[in-house]
């Protein structure tokens, strides 16, 4: 078993917590020292101007993390079988439904 941790940091940048104006931008900080700029997924429920332009949203991160795990598993199997892989590319697609 392994343990994985991250730190999530958000700071209020508006005077009030008005649902129409508070910033959704935050940071994911990892033990490796990497910091990722994150925010909400832009969409009809999120007011314009509250989401950073150069950010990753949690939903995209889940899709990328699952695809990354799949790739690492594939590469490990290939290496154990003595296969040489020169390039790997994936275009994962995730769908979240409200039911």
Give the positions of each predicted feature.
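Extended beta-strand/beta-hairpin segments
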Residues: 1-64, 72-99
């Amino acid at each position: 078993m392994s343990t994985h941790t991250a730190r999530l940091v958000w700071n209020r940048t508006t005077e009030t917590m008005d649902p129409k104006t508070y910033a959704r931008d935050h940071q994911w900080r990892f033990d490796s020292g990497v910091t990722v700029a994150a925010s909400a997924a832009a969409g009809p429920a999120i007011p314009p101007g509250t989401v950073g332009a150069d950010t990753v949203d949690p939903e995209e991160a889940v899709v990328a993390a699952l695809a990354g795990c799949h790739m690492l598993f594939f590469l490990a199997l290939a290496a154990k079988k003595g296969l040489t892989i020169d390039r790997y590319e994936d275009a994962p697609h995730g769908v979240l439904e409200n039911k």
